[in-house]
């Protein structure tokens, strides 16, 4: 199976159908207010397609990592008329309100996802129901297939067609991602899922060359499989974040008290040798922004070269490194970014990460760079920098995108029906998809 062989929502008969849509509304909520609605807005093209075609939407999502209860204890939810008090932070109720405002139509909130048959039975074409957080029940993510199936059977009874638009959880084998489509015998990708699949199919297939991977984050161990897999596909590799110091130490540089995974030094040496053999140019930081403690200060130390003084820890890439990385991105026609360059949450150490975001945004806007942000912290940084809207694609799935880049298959994609006619990588590009996303 290649990524882009999956059935599209465009192939589904939606008229008069109750359409079960697995969305990813796992958004940040503070004091009952949504602080970033990007994931909700990302689902709008799919929802509008169903509603325009004369269907109704039954939406399923999770929010956070609540401590779920077994289905056998469902009375705990039903006796209170909704979510127990200790779970209030994970309720999807604020999302229903936000979605209603975005869709300009009522959204009915069902306070118990497994006790919504009555609400769903009264739906008419054009109606939208949002079920409460599916993770309030343990069976959603149970390791036991029979438990997942038991929950999926109830949810599957609410609809006629299953659409998956939750790329962010596509790496999960769960009741709502894999259980329901197995029961209904039909499953198609929504527009967000299609867009995600399209871009990753291109970067993992035949991307415009040269292709640069910018990889950062805290641990080499978190990115071993990604680095191994991508080394077969890229022309340049830029390494930043705390993981860079393991590579620098492996080359004999002083790293002060910067983070280092001693157990991964040999892997770092091996990867650098492998890159050399494959003629992949690996570029490591040539200067650093440092301090003696892990805290923000007005005037952090900027090193002259790769070496970090004793008693100091590097917290961002330095200005010379920024210049070199930006120049490298400027040479390329495709770029994939996974992981920040420094502790970008602290202003003194955000310049490296934001410079990468700006270089990718500018390259996309001015020179047609195909730029893909692999979700997670990189997506947050792209948003904070103001560059997200200029990127070709900002993934909604940190974990899912990481697993794809590692060369793994995603259960939530594999389970979907096959396309009636397989399209090529070239035709899986932005095309008409970009038009659906221009207003987001």
From Swiss-Prot:
Gene Ontology MF terms in the entry: ADP binding; ATP binding; metal ion binding; phosphoglycerate kinase activity
Binding-site residues for (2R)-3-phosphoglycerate, renumbered to this chain: 23-26, 39, 61-62, 64-65, 135, 171-172, 219
GO cellular component terms given for this protein: cytosol; glycosome
Residue positions binding AMP: 218-219, 223, 242, 314, 345
Reactions listed under catalytic activity: (2R)-3-phosphoglycerate + ATP = (2R)-3-phospho-glyceroyl phosphate + ADP
Subcellular location: Glycosome
Binding site for CDP: 217, 222, 241, 339, 344
GO biological process: gluconeogenesis; glycolytic process
The family this protein is said to belong to: Belongs to the phosphoglycerate kinase family.
HAMAP family: Phosphoglyc_kinase (MF_00145)
Name of this chain's protein: Phosphoglycerate kinase, glycosomal
Organism: Trypanosoma brucei brucei
């Amino acid at each position: 199976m290649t990524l882009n062989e999956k059935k599209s929502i465009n192939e589904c008969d939606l008229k008069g159908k109750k359409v079960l849509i697995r969305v990813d509304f796992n958004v940040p909520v503070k004091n009952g207010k949504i602080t970033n609605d990007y994931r909700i807005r990302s689902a709008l093209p799919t929802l509008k397609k169903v509603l325009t075609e004369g269907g109704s939407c039954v939406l399923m999502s999770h929010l956070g990592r609540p401590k779920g209860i077994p289905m056998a204890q469902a009375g705990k939810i039903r006796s209170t008329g909704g979510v127990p008090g200790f779970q209030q932070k994970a309720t999807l109720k604020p999302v229903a309100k936000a979605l209603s405002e975005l869709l300009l139509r009522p959204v009915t909130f069902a306070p118990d996802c497994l006790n919504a048959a009555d609400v769903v039975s009264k739906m008419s074409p054009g109606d939208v129901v949002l079920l409460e957080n599916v993770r309030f029940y343990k069976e959603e993510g149970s390791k036991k297939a029979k438990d997942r199936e038991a929950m999926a059977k109830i949810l599957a009874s609410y609809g006629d067609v299953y659409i998956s638009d939750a790329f962010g959880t596509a790496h999960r084998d769960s009741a709502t991602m894999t259980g329901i489509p197995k029961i209904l015998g039909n499953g198609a990708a929504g527009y967000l899922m299609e867009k995600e699949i399209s871009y990753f199919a291109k970067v993992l297939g035949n991307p415009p060359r040269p292709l640069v991977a910018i990889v950062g984050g805290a641990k080499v161990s978190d990115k071993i499989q990604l680095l191994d897999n991508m080394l077969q596909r890229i022309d340049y590799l830029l390494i930043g974040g705390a993981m860079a110091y393991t590579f620098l130490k492996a080359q004999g540089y002083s790293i002060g008290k910067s983070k280092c995974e001693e157990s991964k030094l040999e892997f770092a040496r091996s990867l650098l040798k492998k890159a050399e053999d494959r003629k992949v140019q690996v570029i490591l930081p040539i200067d650093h922004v440092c301090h003696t403690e892990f805290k923000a200060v007005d005037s952090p130390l900027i090193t002259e070269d790769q070496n970090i003084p004793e008693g100091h820890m590097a917290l961002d890439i330095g200005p010379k490194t920024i210049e070199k990385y930006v120049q490298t991105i400027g040479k390329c026609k495709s770029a994939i970014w996974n992981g920040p360059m420094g502790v970008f949450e602290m202003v003194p150490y955000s310049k490296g990460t934001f410079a990468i975001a700006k270089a990718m945004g500018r390259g996309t806007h001015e020179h047609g760079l195909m730029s893909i942000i692999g979700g997670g912290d990189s997506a947050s940084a792209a948003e904070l920098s103001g560059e997200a809207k200029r990127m070709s694609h900002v993934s909604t799935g940190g974990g899912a995108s990481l697993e794809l880049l590692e060369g793994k298959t995603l259960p939530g994609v594999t389970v979907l029906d096959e396309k009636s006619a397989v399209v090529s990588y070239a035709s899986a590009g932005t095309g008409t998809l970009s038009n659906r996303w221009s207003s987001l």
